Amino acid sequence: MTSTPLLSVVIPSYNYARFLGDCLTSIFNQTNAPPFEVVVVDDGSTDETPQVLEMYADPCLRVVRHDRNRGHVATVNEALGLARGTFIARIDPDDRYRPHFMSEICRVLADNPEVGFVYGRAALIDDRGVETGPITAAPHEGDFKGSEFIRLLEQNFVCAPASAGRREAWLEHVPVPAGLAFNDWYFSVLIARTYPFYFLDDVIADYRVHGANHHTKISKDGSEERSIFWLLDRVFEPQEDGFPFEPSREDVMRRVYGAHYLDLAEKYFGFGHNADARRCYLAAIRCRPSCLSDPGVARRFGATVLSRTMYDKTKALLGRGR
């Protein structure tokens, strides 16, 4: 094992044996890779995860196995604490890297010592590993270096497998609080509050969409909503040395809270959770009344107040061109 890896790749893993091999292969098949280590913390998997890890025995690979499941947040905290690299990247076992991921993110961080975090674009893949399209539109035209804090408060546009940061930037925010439903946005927002970011305008990772995605589960059960507003309440808590919000803290709060309530309303509407959708639409309208100028938003909000059945019938008729 390299005594001083430049990069640590940490993988919190639980019952993803069917995808883990693809993830590890993408790591060990990097081109022009710097000295690196891979830290896998297996959170008590009951599938073939141990057998998959044995197939990838390598001096660069360190494996920690829990005898019982301790939960995703505890596993992430442990994995980050074990990382020894100057830079750290975190990837879930169902995602994978493009061959130039390591060389590119390490180049950017080495060439820009003031930058705390680098992220690039990601492509969507299905459960078979077939690319299905881009995950989102690129947030910038070309490479970008600067503050992403306010933009990240409004929208989580950093795809976890397509990102990496300096060790100290990560560890300033470890441990992740127990009960937080996700940690990607937590790290992005809090690191962006202190450090400039660098956007690399290139596809450097693949994000897999499948039926067991963690994010879909937390969106449906409400834990995503609770975690979002826990973090926002913390960020906007008045502090003497706080971030200088412009034009004012209150204006930024209305914009940010409104954006998240609207996003949650649209998700709940898609899941058929009408009461939650209506509640979040109303909160979004209170924060940002202009969101009703979007005809689609207005129609969907109306459907939660009046009749979802009428909305579905109207949508079907319009879809047939009537």
Listing of model-derived features with the role each one plays in the protein:
Residues 25-35:
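Short, acidic, metal-binding catalytic loop of nucleotide-sugar glycosyltransferases
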Residues 139-228:
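Conserved nucleotide-sugar donor-binding catalytic segment
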